[in-house]
Amino acid sequence: MISYRKLAMRVLGHSPVSAVKTARRSTGKRAAALALTAALVVGMTLPAFAQDWYIEDGDISISAGENGNNVTQGGTTTENDTDTVIKSKDSSTASSNTVTIDAGEGKTVNVTLDNVTINVDEGSKYGYEPDAYKTAVSVTGSGNTNIELNGNNTLTSGYGHAGLEHNKTDDSGTLTIQDEKNDDGSAKGSASDTTGSLTATGGYHSAGIGGSDGHDGQVTITGGEITATGGNGAAGIGGGAGDTDAVGGDGDVTISGGTITATGGSLGAGIGGGAYGNGTVTVTDGDITAKATGRYGAGIGGGYGAKPKPSGTLIGGNGTVTISGGTITEASGGYMAAGIGSGFQGLGTVTIEGDAVIKNAQGGEAGAGIGSGTYGDSEIIIRGDAVIENAESSANGAGIGSGQGDLYPDGDGMVIDPTVGNVTIEGNAKIENAKSGYGGSGIGGGAVGIGNVIIRGNAQIGNATGGEEGAGIGGGALGTGDVTIEGNVTIENAQGGAGAAGIGGGAETEPDTEDTRNKVSIKSTEAGSPNITAAGGGVLNDENAPLAGAAAIGSGSVADGATEVKSDITIEGKVTINATSGGDVAIGDSTNGETQFSGLQVGTTITRRNAKGDDVSQPGDVVREQAPTETEAAEAPSTGSVEVERPVTVEGLYVTNVLGKQITHTCTQNGTTLTIRANGIVASAHLTLGMVRTLKAQGVKTLVFTTLLSRSTTVSVDALLAAEPDAPDETAVVWTHTGPRAALTIDGADHSDLLK
């Protein structure tokens, strides 16, 4: 058995420019000059002109004006500055002055940071009094702020404040970090383009970019090279640390470009939520590396989630992540958290679609690579042309699915509180490697976790490898699997860990009062036929609780004297399956033995072998082409030679599906019989009488059409030509199968009576 322990956790814890004038000024000009001088003396506002602002000259405050920004520095305000650029005179020396941006409701403030270095970190000299410390750059207000990056910018804030701070409230606007122009202000689009950068470091309990201590954070990034590091309890990009009163901690982050490196503090996500915070992260483009350095925070997603007594209501931890483009180079979760998904105890809701590429998603111990952290369920959809190169849990979490569930003593028995990994993989999605280090499934449930998995469409799975006692696809240790595979799916290797099924249940799963079973459904559809290779886990040589080898498809094994959960397995249509048991039964369970199937379609091949390599195939596992009819046999040449079926090409012939779209077909000829095959339930073969006449001249006497879920139908070439003897060569012949029904038309007229 796997030993699991419960956790006890606590959060510890600009100057006027002078000019020499030689001409005498008019009275009006002298009056204007006097007025200007008076304004400077009493701190009144100046008329607008664009200029650079140097951070060494004092704190800078910016707000939205009527036709630009109102900028205040050193007691002087300039109105309607049309191009606000903040610089450092010497970027190698940090300034302790700050920038505050306040965008009013319905307004937009545009600011450029150009090689600015600010460091206002004073350690903890004032104790726990966040208001006594300073923020390098703070963004507030109900309007929107856009910050353009030129050169290299570095922002380091004090205790309790984010490096670049934007606290999300009910009426706050948005903060967008961008790199739309080159450093010289020119438009991008050439080989000499420059990239602006930002390095932001948050203080204690505060994000690198986003929320301060006790606050939610909102950030949008569209470009630039961004490096963000959160303080203890906070996200690298996203929320500051929240609290058990559900105040703060949430992170709302959108990324549509740039190169991002984000590191969360302990309990915080790399990108997403801080401690006690949820993470909502949307990625449409960019190159991202996100890490949670301590415990309980996801790489991308939720921070630490808690269920404080007496309510037991979950606060934080949830991760809602949508990735529709770009590349996630690495997403690493902390201990008990997912690489992409939720933190400790949270729900991991993850959608990966479009052309997104996940190079490496690494869950911490007991957290999934993609999915949920410990004690959390997951809802995962991977679709479109998304590619997952590697998704892995170091131990007890699924590669893709849920984190570890709970198992604890109760009297003389044990209570099992499983997590649930709901995973759908569809479209043209490709999973190259999904793996658990120990206890969890490759795809499905973590240890003490149920795996509900749907794989369909044209999805491809390379390796799905369970850890010890975890299924390749299905349940983790002590968990059942409910797996549906349908369509043109390829699974190259579903490998169960010791005692667990390749596809199906984890090891040591015993029957419950509701007779819950491992369920596996495999079937072909119009999209095509599944091609699956699965292997059950081998023997577990544990002197305390040894386990026998498990089925390739079906149930995991149990310890001596225990009862194995039964399996319900259905296979329909045309399939190709290579199943190798880790024990005696390849497809099924130890109680009922091998599961037999009937009524499968022509072309089906199921190969079964036990752990010794013996063939344990069953009747109906291999379905060949139907034997020729008596008429076909009589028409065959009596040369005494053996005819061999060979592939042929019929020029102009094509096959469509129910939507009228062309689908793949093959043609083979055996003697005088030509067979057209298509992987479709509703399919139509399109010929012309000219094609049929050519085939007759080539010696073909019988045509056969074979599709999924339909008997093969035949037609005599002579009978077909005799039906419309005077019709021109271009006359259309359409031969349709709709499930078990068949129809034949010539120039739109029904001639189905010719079919046999």
Please tell me what each predicted stretch does:
Residues 2-3, 9, 16, 30-36, ...:
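A composition-driven surface/loop motif
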Residues 15-27:
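Short, Lys/Arg-rich N-terminal segment immediately upstream of the first membrane anchor
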